[in-house]
Amino acid sequence: MGYDDTSLANVPPVEDKDLLIPRQKYLLSGVHVGTGIRTKDMEKFIYRVRPDGLCIIDIRKIDERIRTAGKFLARFDPDRVLAVSARIYGFKPVRKFAEYTGAMYITGRILPGTLTNPQAPLHLEPDVVLLSDPRVDRQIHIESVRMGIPVVALVDADNMLENIDLAIPVNNKGRRSLALVYWLLTREVLRNRKVIPPDGDLPEGYEEFATRIMGVR
């Protein structure tokens, strides 16, 4: 049996005017479609569980945490923010976030000692770290905790929240989902820094934040 991920049955009662973007845009990107595994930590973010076992994340909480994260990240000097993705679908979203906000970024394999060893080939000293998935970006997560660096993380239904200072519940594996979340975070950071007006937009849509994979549209 197939499921329509764009159905409004997947969202709690909420008006578009109360969200950063219309509900349908959230649904079309699949930000709300979580994994079939649900940790106890993440139960508070789950709206419902589909008959096939997949968790549907509450878009009100997605929206709320993106707003909160945007305000939080905007407080730091741009070049002291580090965005990370070891997962390929996060490569371009992270790069675009860094391009617009002035943040540092790492994509792909992360070398041990990046945050903890001043003699490492690539040694960085961020004041805050943004992880695309704390499980996949585990090396930076561990080092951030060791160095006392605040951690903001995109977390799916199967993630744990230990040693995460600010969690953004979301599908952190999907190509379009990651593109939309990083696009929104970028916009919120720039709005809070007053780089763009409170209702301002980026010059390109979230689709331009999506990683291009051959044969995938």
Curated annotation (Swiss-Prot):
- SUPFAM superfamilies noted in UniProt: Ribosomal protein S2
Q: Which Pfam families match?
A: Ribosomal_S2
Tell me the GO BP annotations in alphabetical order.
ribosomal small subunit assembly; translation
Sorted keywords for this record are: Ribonucleoprotein, Ribosomal protein
Task: List the GO molecular function terms.
Answer: structural constituent of ribosome
Q: Work out whether the entry's keyword set contains Ribonucleoprotein.
A: yes
Q: Which GO terms describe its cellular component?
A: cytosolic small ribosomal subunit
Similarity section: Belongs to the universal ribosomal protein uS2 family.
The name under which this protein is listed is Small ribosomal subunit protein uS2
Gene name, per UniProt, is rps2
